[in-house]
Amino acid sequence: MNQKTTPFEKTRPDRVRKQYKKQEEFTLYGWNSCMSAFKARPESLLRVFFSRARSAELKDVKVFCGENKLPYRQLDQESLNKVAAGVHHEGVIMVVKPRLPESAHRLIRGKMSDKGLVVVLDSIDNPHNQGAILRTCAFFGVEGLIIPGNGKASVIPSSAARMAEGGLEAVPVFTSSDLPSALRDCREQGWFVVGADPSAKETLFNAKVKFPAVVVMGNEQEGLSSRVKQKCDMVVRVPGKGSLQSLNVSVAAGIILAEIDRRRKTFKKN
């Protein structure tokens, strides 16, 4: 007896294909984020959309697309806004294969330089803050960024990639489903874990930091979670003199990384 196919069963393969397609594609927009990706990994390019004003500047990209039979198309402003789901695309959008993050264990078990520097984000979900911190990490040569996640999909949204201005291609991103355990493993490897929290008693500029170092940033509302804070060797704050008690987390990250980068240039291991 033939069994009838239900409407759900008919649509399920299409849903699965759409889900896989979504996981296998990542939309970049903004000139620096797009061109950094193209220069770093042109083989990941899938298709390109651009404005008339950007057409001449994208000559090399269009030649590459032609040679590799990849679609590219000039669009008007309204159409570009729809593809990017916003207006901050600067006239260029690239759909690429995503750089899927690896497990933090790979970073922790690997070889870290004596003056290595890693950044960990604890519950920082705002894409603008993620992107700004990623850009700062790239500027100071951070060797890895660890973010909560399971590693099965991209954890950096397109808007964060745009804010990073190419930083996504410069800084390896790793994920951990259990940040306290990852920080414990970092300490077992001899890495010095510094947490940043506005309620800390110790100030950044008085703290004695050792290397390799891990800097942990918490979200602006709650700071570091208690379990994460317990795994830090030291918790510091950026001292201020004004009426406001705290900084935007991406600004605080910039100050902290600048100070720690300054120290690691002259750090001598005992």
Give the residues covered by each predicted segment.
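N-terminal positively charged helical leader segments and presequences
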Residues: 1-109
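Active-site helix-initiating loop/hinge in glycosyltransferases
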Residues: 30, 122, 129, 246-248
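Structured adenosyl-cofactor binding patch, chiefly the S-adenosyl-L-methionine
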Residues: 35, 139, 159-167, 226-270
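RNA substrate-binding interface of SAM-dependent RNA methyltransferases
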Residues: 43, 50, 60, 66, ...
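Short, glycine/polar-rich helix-capping loops at beta-to-alpha or helix-loop-helix junctions
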Residues: 57-58, 152-159, 222-231
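Short beta->alpha connector loops at strand-helix junctions that form conserved
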Residues: 76, 97, 122, 148-149, ...
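Active-site/ligand-binding-proximal alpha/beta "capping" segment
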Residues: 194-248
